[in-house]
Amino acid sequence: MAGYWKNEEATNEVLNDEGWFKSGDLGYFNGPFLHIVDRVKDLVIRGGENISCIEVEAAIYEHESVSEVCVFGIPEERLGEKLCAAIHLKDSKNLDEDELNSFLAERLAKFKIPAFVVFEDNPLPRVGSG
C-alpha cells in the first residue's frame, strides 16, 4: 500500500517506517498457520494491563439477567483508561452493580471488572449492520 490518497496523516497512522500496514489485528503463528484472535481497538489499556472488551462482555453475558452489554474504555488521567459497561437487562430481571461485581469476581481478574456500570432501560443502540 502506497498510502491514503492526499492524506499523509492517515497514512502515517497505519504504515510503519518499513511500509508495513498496521491492520489492528492481534494474532499468533502456530507453525505455518496465522491465527487472528482479537483487535487492538477492542483492548482497553488500564495502567499498562491489556483488557479484552470481548472477554469482559462474555463474562457479563453469563449472568442470566443480562440481555445486552457493551464494554468500552473511558479516559482516566492516572491509568490511561478505565472500563465501563453499559448493560440492558432482560424483561422482569433485576441486577445491581454490587451483585454484578460479585458475579464477575468469580470469573475475571479484579483489574478486569468494570469500574463503572450503566444500566440502560432501552436496548443498546446499533449501527445499520447490527
Q: In which residue ranges do the predicted regions lie?
A:
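Short, glycine-anchored, charge-dense loop/turn motifs used at functional sites
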Residues: P32, S129-G130
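AMP-binding/adenylate-forming catalytic domain of the ANL superfamily
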Residues: A109-S129
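AMP-binding/adenylate-forming catalytic core of the ANL superfamily
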Residues: A2-G3, E8-E13, E18, G24-K112
